[in-house]
Amino acid sequence: MQTQVLFEHPLNEKMRTWLRIEFLIQQLTVNLPIVDHAGALHFFRNVSELLDVFERGEVRTELLKELDRQQRKLQTWIGVPGVDQSRIEALIQQLKAAGSVLISAPRIGQFLREDRLIALVRQRLSIPGGCCSFDLPTLHIWLHLPQAQRDSQVETWIASLNPLTQALTMVLDLIRQSAPFRKQTSLNGFYQDNGGDADLLRLNLSLDSQLYPQISGHKSRFAIRFMPLDSENGQVPERLDFELACC
């Protein structure tokens, strides 16, 4: 059985931001619990990058707009024969609840910005080797606290992002499920099509091909060029089958 590799590519700035936030939040929990310097730096570096992303745009505003848009889309299915009405109603209520929590939450990331330890580490992350014990004795002593004490603090930091995480997860799940995968074929390593106002491209490609896609474009039109992983000896077949969803 062939192994399929999923590639996702945003077709607008809001989706690019959402995917980056999703990626960084996922990275926060990869190396938990924090037991050493390496795990701590991985965690704090991702926190710092998250805060940088938050400061660049209106994340809350865009998410609230999308939660409302998804509710309107679901409402068009109310009363349609053959559609699970209880499921539609449940999703609409979940979207409303996520929006209410998000709109009443403090400024996104504010709890993390105001934390003294996070602020100290952020100041040193851009300096090569800047998080040594003599540079950051605060972090050094924190790593020697009882594990349960560190775990509790980390859980509190992550929980402060719950209003955002809940809303973002719902939005991205609905967008990803909005379009099915369809078989497509590239010619000489190239494929292009109309986006149809899509926000996100999802592409399944066989690992056996040892190829990856370079995607460019926007919601109205996009192009995909397939490139060999081995840039010197790899080859791109004249015809290449893959699966594509325009969400």
UniProtKB/Swiss-Prot annotation:
GO biological process, one term: FtsZ-dependent cytokinesis
Gene3D superfamilies: YacF-like, YacF-like domains
Cellular compartments annotated: Cytoplasm
GO cellular component, one term: cytoplasm
UniProt-listed InterPro entries: ZapD (IPR009777), ZapD_C (IPR027462), ZapD_sf (IPR036268)
Keywords of the record: Cell cycle, Cell division, Cytoplasm, Septation
Main localization (coarse): cytoplasm
Subunit text: Interacts with FtsZ.
Function: Cell division factor that enhances FtsZ-ring assembly. Directly interacts with FtsZ and promotes bundling of FtsZ protofilaments, with a reduction in FtsZ GTPase activity.
Family per record: Belongs to the ZapD family.
HAMAP family: ZapD
Protein name per Swiss-Prot or TrEMBL: Cell division protein ZapD
The organism of origin for this protein: Escherichia coli O1:K1 / APEC
